[in-house]
């Protein structure tokens, strides 16, 4: 198992300087799968499996495993790893106290999914307790259980396991196999396309007209767009990933230049950590090879927990250290007087002329069976969403 080499003439290095690769293949994989039958087993939930995959493929470079206590504490308290690199979200493996009692430091542990599939192994270096309320307050900015990310923290086991992992089997993303590229592959893709500058766009919503406006504004100053939708675990009222993916396909086909945009899945779980998660999203896109990253209004937010531009304000503090250029956009809207999409920076008209678009509004209208106006959504996208949700 070796680290992937960064393409030498590519313009941006991964976070920490090298792209981590913990994927085990060939004879070593066969041997480890056989040996893992004798290892002590732990079952990971879908969130844990997503994290395991992203560590394994280098999306979470420079992490090589689940965090030890020193890194965990530094991350939640200081937004950095113990080696000094910016990192904003704890990537941890929780277990119950009874599970932890059966494990000894130095053990090789087999990591299974809830489907019974073996996904990887962990070399146990550390077991440690943590303060759930403190983690919630520092990472999510609230201790309210109504926050979906905080709820997950409170539901977790009381012990974290730390240590390096090996990824033996990949989670299945069959419905999206054409769009499932690892960071080493996106870097090669950008190189092959001749893109020297690439802007990443994170989304868990269908692309509405405000998103399209922001993406195309960014495309005016870079070579290519990586539309990188999250397809891991989200809230139950979010639009399902398969429906969203079809909507992305149709908008790219009909409204974007073929040689300047690519669709690739981001196989992560959504934490809804707002400003902190914006930093993680930028870091991961840097690992995928993006030189620029878009942060819009209430990035990775939920409800009213974060201010409209709080994520932009926090990420600006770390932009130089992150090493990826952050493109900050104001809330875009359709202006009836201008007759097009705009922001407060480009439109002089009063708010009564503005039609504000958001993923929340799109979801509400679709759930209520309402059609989406063309000022809100491209008709082809609306058709896909209405049909997809009707079939669910």
Swiss-Prot record:
A GO term for molecular function: sulfate adenylyltransferase (ATP) activity
Biochemical pathway: Sulfur metabolism; hydrogen sulfide biosynthesis; sulfite from sulfate: step 1/3
Gene3D superfamilies: HUPs, Sulfate adenylyltransferase
Keyword Nucleotide-binding tagged: yes
GO biological process: hydrogen sulfide biosynthetic process; sulfate assimilation
Pfam families the UniProt entry points to: ATP-sulfurylase (PF01747), PUA_2 (PF14306)
UniProt family annotation: Belongs to the sulfate adenylyltransferase family.
Name of the protein described by the UniProt record: Sulfate adenylyltransferase
Source organism: Staphylococcus epidermidis (strain ATCC 12228 / FDA PCI 1200)
Taxonomic classification: Bacteria, Bacillati, Bacillota, Bacilli, Bacillales
């Amino acid at each position: 198992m070796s680290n992937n080499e960064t393409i030498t003439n590519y313009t941006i290095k991964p976070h920490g300087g090298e792209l981590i690769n913990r994927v085990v293949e060939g004879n070593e994989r066969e041997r480890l799968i056989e040996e893992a039958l004798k290892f002590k087993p732990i079952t990971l939930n879908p969130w844990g499996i997503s994290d395991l995959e992203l560590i394994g493929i280098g999306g979470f470079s420079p992490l090589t495993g689940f965090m030890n206590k020193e890194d965990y504490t530094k991350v939640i308290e200081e937004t950095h790893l113990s080696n000094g690199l910016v990192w904003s979200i704890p990537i941890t493996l929780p277990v119950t106290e009874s599970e932890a009692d059966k494990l000894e430091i130095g053990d090789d542990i087999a990591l299974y999914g809830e489907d019974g599939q073996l996904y990887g192994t962990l070399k146990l270096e550390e077991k440690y307790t943590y303060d759930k309320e403190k983690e919630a307050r520092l990472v999510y900015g609230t201790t309210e259980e109504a926050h979906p990310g905080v709820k997950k923290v409170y539901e977790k086991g009381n012990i974290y396991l730390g240590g390096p992992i090996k990824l033996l089997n990949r989670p299945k993303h069959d419905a999206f196999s054409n769009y499932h590229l690892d960071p080493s592959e996106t870097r090669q893709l950008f190189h092959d396309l001749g893109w020297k500058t690439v802007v990443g766009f994170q989304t868990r919503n269908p692309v509405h007209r405000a998103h399209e406006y922001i993406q195309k504004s960014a495309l005016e100053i870079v070579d290519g767009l990586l539309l990188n939708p999250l397809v891991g675990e989200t809230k139950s009222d979010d639009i399902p990933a398969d429906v969203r993916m079809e909507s992305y396909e149709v908008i790219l086909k009909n409204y974007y230049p073929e040689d300047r945009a690519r669709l690739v899945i981001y196989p992560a779980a959504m934490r809804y950590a707002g400003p902190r998660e914006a930093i993680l999203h930028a870091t991961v896109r840097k690992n995928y090879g993006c030189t620029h990253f878009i942060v819009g209004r209430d990035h990775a937010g939920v409800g009213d927990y974060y201010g409209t531009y709080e994520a932009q304000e926090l990420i600006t503090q770390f932009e130089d250290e992150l090493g990826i250029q952050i493109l900050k956009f104001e809330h875009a809207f359709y202006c009836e007087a201008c007759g097009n999409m705009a922001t407060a920076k480009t439109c002089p008209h009063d708010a009564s002329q503005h039609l504000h678009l958001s993923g929340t509004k799109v979801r509400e209208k679709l759930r209520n069976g309402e059609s989406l106006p063309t000022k809100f959504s491209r008709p082809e996208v609306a058709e896909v969403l209405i049909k997809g949700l009707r079939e669910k």
